[in-house]
Amino acid sequence: MSYTPGVGGDPAQLAQRISSNIQKITQCSAEIQRTLNQLGTPQDSPELRQQLQQKQQYTNQLTKETDKYIKEFGSLPTTPSEQRQRKIQKDRLVGEFTTSLTNFQKVQRQAAEREKEFVARVRASSRVSGSFPEDSSKERNLVSWESQTQPQVQVQDEEITEDDLRLIHERESSIRQLEADIMDINEIFKDLGMMIHEQGDVIDSIEANVENAEVHVQQANQQLSRAADYQRKSRKTLCIIILILVIGVVIIGLIIWGLNR
């Protein structure tokens, strides 16, 4: 599976794509675990190991794709009013992705250990011959070494065969790939940690600006309240002065009227 960047810049579609990938990673990890449990049993076969490797590669690609989607989701523009809700949504996706990554890395480590055990058995069996059912299917017999029922063995001085070398090289190559995939997952974990830290700094800055704005609004409201009080007092004083003037005019008018009589 290859990464196809962008879903039209739609946060809802991008979040849905991320959630879908997380579910796939979780499902694939469970399938890988079931396959690992079949290794070393009668169900083991080269075909089964090939399917296991393909499933691991597919899941590893999913993790890289999801990491890019989450980065894209975090870089989408947003308004201050949407910021907190976007952060909650992103934190949820990051948490779910981290859980699925942890499970996948766990089964990857188990797969690497199984491959190392297989190589060790191949190396050991290269100098051991036993009463195996078919000489032509040596790989199947080596894989099922643990499930054999007490074969009669004797040590020989023969050198390691070309088939043994081929098996060892294939498994060692698989081990190197698994270890590289595990390192890739570690890098994704680091990316997720950085994204959470940066997102937290952005939110803290926005919250600080909002708090400062609220303080300024409160101060402005207090100033407006004081101005309104002052205006009411000024109007009251003006009304009293006018009333006094009116009373004074009435009194003067009465005095003049009395003198004229």
UniProtKB/Swiss-Prot annotation:
Annotated positions of the Phosphothreonine modification: T4, T79
Topology within the bilayer: Single-pass type IV membrane protein
Segments forming a coiled coil: 47-69
InterPro entries: SNARE (IPR010989), Syntaxin (IPR045242), Syntaxin/epimorphin_CS (IPR006012), Syntaxin_N (IPR006011), T_SNARE_dom (IPR000727)
Cytoplasmic-side positions: 2-238
Transmembrane region(s): 239-259
Positions of post-translational N-acetylserine modification: S2
Residue stretches making up the t-SNARE coiled-coil homology domain: 165-227
Vesicular side: 260-261
Cellular-component GO terms for this entry: early endosome membrane; SNARE complex; synaptic vesicle
GO process annotations (BP): intracellular protein transport; vesicle docking; vesicle fusion
Principal location: membrane
Gene Ontology molecular-function annotations: SNAP receptor activity; SNARE binding
UniProt modified residues of type Phosphoserine: S45, S75, S125, S126, S129, S205
UniProtKB keywords: Acetylation, Coiled coil, Endosome, Membrane, Phosphoprotein, Transmembrane, Transmembrane helix
Protein localization: Early endosome membrane
Region (Disordered): 129-148
Family of the protein in this entry: Belongs to the syntaxin family.
Subunit architecture: Forms a SNARE complex with VTI1B, STX8 and VAMP8 which functions in the homotypic fusion of late endosomes. Component of the SNARE complex composed of STX7, STX8, VAMP7 and VTI1B that is required for heterotypic fusion of late endosomes with lysosomes. Interacts with VPS11, VPS16 and VPS18. Interacts with VPS33A. Interacts with TPC1.
Free-text function comment from the UniProt entry: May be involved in protein trafficking from the plasma membrane to the early endosome (EE) as well as in homotypic fusion of endocytic organelles. Mediates the endocytic trafficking from early endosomes to late endosomes and lysosomes.
Family matches, as PANTHER family: SYNTAXIN, SYNTAXIN-7
Protein name: Syntaxin-7
Protein's organism: Pongo abelii
